[in-house]
Each structure stands twice: as structure tokens, then as C-alpha cells.
Swiss-Prot record:
It catalyses: UDP-N-acetyl-alpha-D-muramate + NADP(+) = UDP-N-acetyl-3-O-(1-carboxyvinyl)-alpha-D-glucosamine + NADPH + H(+). PROSITE patterns: FAD_PCMH. Residues 25-191 form the FAD-binding PCMH-type domain. Pfam families: FAD_binding_4 (PF01565), MurB_C (PF02873). Belongs to the MurB family. Its cofactor is FAD. Pathway: Cell wall biogenesis; peptidoglycan biosynthesis. SUPFAM superfamilies: FAD-binding/transporter-associated domain-like (SSF56176), Uridine diphospho-N-Acetylenolpyruvylglucosamine reductase, MurB, C-terminal domain (SSF56194). This is UDP-N-acetylenolpyruvoylglucosamine reductase. Keywords: Cell cycle, Cell division, Cell shape, Cell wall biogenesis/degradation, Cytoplasm, FAD, Flavoprotein, NADP, Oxidoreductase, Peptidoglycan synthesis. GO terms for biological process: cell division; cell wall organization; peptidoglycan biosynthetic process; regulation of cell shape. It is found in: Cytoplasm.
Length: 314
């Protein structure tokens, strides 16, 4: 990896355990884990990877992500403090792709701005939230994003307008394009700060009560299918609540969460996901779709997605 790190000005670690960088606390080592110093450093790293034929991917907060037990062959990029700036201009909020989404929501509410408060409990980076069109409580990123700056797989900076992002339910164009979100422009609206703060506290209290925050997890595992029953309700109806394989367990608090009760492996989680899907299909006649992004499943090779991780409602 010396040909990759020679001109790199940021931080880098070899054979870095990905269990340190995912909310499931699961995952084997990455060949190289890199935190760029700035946009130019990031662009240069991507160009060198391309020139040398070395695969790369980006990881934000590590939620909604399962890394294979064998780890990742290639470069894993994480956007740190250099990509966590934020700026307000009237109702327009500009922020770096590495910003914590929940912190950004609180920042906006403290300024009396409405539109991002839905994200107060979403454990994702801003870049990941945009890539997956994260949403909760009736809100979604597509409603507030006006433009997105990305660095593509050739190391070029490109800007997409909101209407060019192909937003749909938990989807954007960045799920089919290899690019890293470095900056996002959002437009909010004025609101009642005290009312917004009360609303956020109510939602966070509900989250603490209904979600298994005491154990490592990656957020909701399955997308809610069309119809009146949620994925969690279907899993519970199928009798899978509390079911475990190895160290991985369907949460006894919320059936659409799989928790790491200690020592869980990626193989445990994948086997449990398959078991849940099979039982729900046999019992309810509905095939659940997983929203977990699995990385390194082909012999530990980085996949071609290039987008960041995200999280959505249960």
C-alpha cells in the first residue's frame, strides 16, 4: 500500500479491524483505513487507487453496514473532522459529508429551523443519509436537499442539484454510482424552536424505549413491505422475536433489529437474516427485503458500491 500512502497527508492504518468502525461491532480487518486531510487529499487518494487498480469504499458512521469476518481487501475511506464543517446562511444550511446527522439536526433546531428534526435519532453521517435518502417520522433527506457535491471514482468534484439525485424511498443515484458525498446544501424553514425541541425529545424518548440501544446493532434490518404491518410486526407474528444464532439475536425489544449479544460474527448475522426471511415467508407469505449493506462477502473484496452507510426507521 506504500504507492497509495506516499503522498497521502491524512491519517492511515493498515489491517484496521472494521469492528471498531461499525455500530454492530462486527467485521474483519481492512487492508488500509484512511482519513483524508481535505478534499484534495481525498481526490488524490481516489485517483491513485484507480491508477493502481486498488478497490476502495467509504464508511460513514458504520450503521446499516455488515463487514465480512474476513475483512476488506482494499482501501476504506472515512471522512473525519475535515469534512464536518457546517454553515448557516438565513434558512440555507451547508454541511460537510462527514457531519453526524443527529448533531446536525440539533444544530438546525437550536437555530430555530425546521425540516431536519426528523433525523434527531438517525445514527448516520450526512453523506450516508443523502446516499440512502434516510428518513423517519414522515421526513426524508429528499425534502430538504438542494445540491450535493461529490468526488467521483476519477477523483473529480461534481455537483448534483436535488432534482438530479433520483431520490426515491431509501434510494438515490449514489447507490448505483461510485462517489463520495463531501458537501451538501439544504434549505430549511423557520419554526418554533421550543416546540421543535419538545418534539425531538419526545421522539428520542420513544426511541430509547422502543429500540435495543443497550446492545450493538445496525438499525432496522428489513425494509417495511407494502401493507399495514411493519417488518417488525411480521417478524414477531412469525415467532422469531428473541431467536438467536451464535452471538446474533433478533431483539426482544424490537423485532426488526438484530443485536450483537457478544461475540457475534458476520456469518451469525447473515444466517439469522436468512432464517428470519424464510420463517416470515413461510408464515406470512411475505418476502422481506434486507436493507443491510454487506461488504466483503466475496472473499473479502470491496464491493463496487462506493456509497456511504445510512439508517432508516424501524
Amino acid at each position: 500500500m506504500t504507492q497509495i500512502t506516499r503522498d497521502f497527508r491524512g491519517q492511515w492504518m493498515q489491517q484496521e479491524p472494521m469492528s471498531r468502525h461499525t455500530t454492530w461491532k462486527i467485521g474483519g480487518p481492512a487492508d488500509l483505513f484512511a482519513i483524508p486531510a481535505d478534499e484534495a487529499d481525498l481526490a488524490g487518494l481516489i485517483r491513485r487507487c484507480r491508477e493502481k487498480g486498488i478497490p476502495w469504499m467509504v464508511v460513514g458512521n458504520g450503521s446499516n453496514l455488515l463487514v465480512a469476518d474476513k475483512g476488506i481487501r482494499g482501501v476504506v475511506i472515512h471522512l473525519g473532522r475535515a469534512f464536518s464543517d457546517r454553515r448557516l446562511d438565513d434558512r440555507r444550511l451547508t454541511a460537510g459529508g462527514g457531519c453526524a446527522l443527529s448533531g446536525l439536526a440539533r444544530f438546525a433546531v437550536r437555530a430555530g429551523l425546521q425540516g431536519l428534526e426528523f433525523a434527531c435519532g438517525i445514527p448516520a453521517s450526512l453523506g450516508g443519509a443523502v446516499a440512502m435518502n434516510a428518513g423517519a417520522h414522515g421526513g426524508a433527506m429528499e425534502n430538504i436537499v438542494r445540491w450535493v457535491d461529490v468526488i467521483d471514482d476519477e477523483g473529480r468534484i461534481r455537483r448534483y442539484r436535488g432534482e438530479e439525485m433520483d431520490f426515491a424511498y431509501r434510494h438515490s443515484r449514489l447507490q448505483r454510482e461510485k462517489a463520495i458525498v463531501v458537501r451538501v446544501g439544504m434549505e430549511l424553514r423557520w419554526g418554533d424552536r421550543e416546540a421543535l425541541e419538545r418534539w425531538m425529545e419526545e421522539k428520542l424518548a420513544l426511541r430509547r424505549k422502543s429500540q435495543p440501544l443497550e446492545f450493538p446493532n445496525a438499525g432496522s434490518v428489513f425494509l417495511n413491505p407494502p401493507g399495514s404491518l411493519s417488518a417488525g410486526q411480521l417478524i414477531e407474528e412469525a415467532g422469531m422475536k428473541g431467536f438467536a444464532i451464535g452471538g446474533a439475536q433478533v431483539s426482544e425489544r424490537h423485532a426488526n433489529f438484530i443485536v450483537n449479544r457478544g461475540g457475534a460474527t458476520a456469518a451469525d448475522v447473515l444466517a439469522l437474516i436468512d432464517a428470519v426471511r424464510a420463517r416470515v415467508l413461510a408464515t406470512c407469505g411475505i418476502e422481506l427485503q434486507s436493507e443491510v449493506r454487506v461488504i466483503g462477502d466475496s472473499g473479502g473484496q470491496v464491493d463496487g458500491g462506493g456509497t456511504e452507510d445510512s439508517h432508516q426507521r424501524g
